[in-house]
């Protein structure tokens, strides 16, 4: 059954404007979600333009299939495989822009049955594609205590990672957790110091979700592929929602906006320097939501939009 949860697209105009849409261009929306970005891109494309959308959430795919437009196509899969999708369509080096809206969507958070939220009791799942891979409950029941602690520390930046991991393992030995409420209660009980502005389970839920969905690896692979598929002058427009995501995007754009790093004093000919290649991207800066958008949609508060352009190198 299709859910009817409202989804307000964050930095909608800014992210699409960052693509610098050409009416006859070919674009990728790597995170279709509920189609906010895709619909705006389509409204700016001419008859010859094309939009390829990607999402691994079956509910997003169902929404995408309601778009009756010959310029639009949808792929059910992870955006990390965008290089494969582009190669299959013989479009390597022909993509004029890629948009990624990272992290979990509002409909996923608001639907208790998806298991993403500690605020709503539901199955402890957290998979963006519930048809593939281990659920959060399955992973927590089989993982070693040290591995759980590492995930909480690395992906949640949780200061009490070891205590929480121990509590999770002990609880699962007594009776396996299958509900989000159970995990939230275990985490709260294991947290010795409470933050009055943040639920004690916030970081744990973020960390487990990122691990279950391989979110950071997905981002890194998609960014790497983007250099191969983008046309000269093609744009990357990427919205991040927490520091772990933004760090990856920022580092990627910075590293690929530099020319070849040659030690001072190393004798090299012009020909040798050419072979090393020049910079592959030109970083065009970052944007953050204004006060009005944050007031209307509090989830936009932590978002950061970064834009870069593919160079000729």
UniProtKB/Swiss-Prot annotation:
GO terms for cellular component: cytoplasm. The keyword rRNA-binding does not apply. InterPro entries: RsmH, SAM-dep_MeTrfase_MraW_recog, SAM-dependent_MTases_sf. It comes from Escherichia coli O127:H6 (strain E2348/69 / EPEC). GO terms for biological process: rRNA base methylation. Specifically methylates the N4 position of cytidine in position 1402 (C1402) of 16S rRNA. Keywords: Cytoplasm, Methyltransferase, rRNA processing, S-adenosyl-L-methionine, Transferase. Gene3D superfamilies: Putative methyltransferase TM0872, insert domain (1.10.150.170), Vaccinia Virus protein VP39 (3.40.50.150). Its EC number is 2.1.1.199. Pfam families: Methyltransf_5. This is Ribosomal RNA small subunit methyltransferase H. The gene is rsmH.
């Amino acid at each position: 059954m299709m859910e009817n949860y409202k989804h307000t697209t964050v930095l909608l105009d800014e992210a699409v404007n960052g693509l610098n849409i050409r009416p006859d261009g070919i674009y990728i929306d790597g995170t279709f979600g509920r189609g906010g970005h895709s619909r705006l891109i389509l409204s700016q494309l001419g008859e010859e333009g094309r939009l390829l959308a990607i999402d691994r959430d079956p509910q997003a795919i169902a929404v995408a299939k309601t778009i009756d437009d010959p310029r639009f196509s949808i792929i059910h899969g992870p955006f990390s495989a965008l290089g494969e999708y582009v190669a299959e369509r013989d479009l390597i080096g022909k993509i004029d822009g890629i948009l990624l809206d990272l992290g979990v969507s509002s409909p996923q958070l608001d639907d208790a049955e998806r298991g993403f939220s500690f605020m709503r009791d539901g199955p402890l799942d957290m998979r963006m594609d519930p048809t593939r891979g281990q659920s959060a409950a399955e992973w927590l029941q089989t993982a070693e205590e040290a591995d759980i602690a590492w995930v909480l520390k690395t992906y949640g930046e949780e200061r009490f990672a070891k205590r929480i991991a121990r509590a999770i393992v002990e609880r699962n030995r007594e009776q396996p957790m299958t509900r989000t409420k159970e995990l939230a209660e275990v985490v709260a009980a294991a947290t010795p110091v409470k933050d009055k502005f943040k639920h004690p389970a916030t970081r744990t839920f973020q960390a487990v979700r990122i691990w279950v969905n391989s979110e950071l690896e997905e981002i890194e692979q998609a960014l790497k592929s983007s250099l191969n598929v983008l046309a000269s002058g093609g744009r990357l427009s990427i919205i991040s929602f927490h520091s772990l995501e933004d760090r990856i995007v920022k580092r990627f754009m910075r590293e690929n906006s530099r020319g070849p790093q040659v030690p001072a004093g190393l004798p090299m000919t012009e020909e040798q320097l050419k072979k090393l290649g020049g910079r592959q991207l030109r970083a065009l800066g970052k944007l953050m939501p204004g006060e009005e958008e944050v007031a209307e949609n509090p989830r936009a508060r932590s978002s950061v939009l970064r834009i870069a352009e593919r160079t000729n190198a």
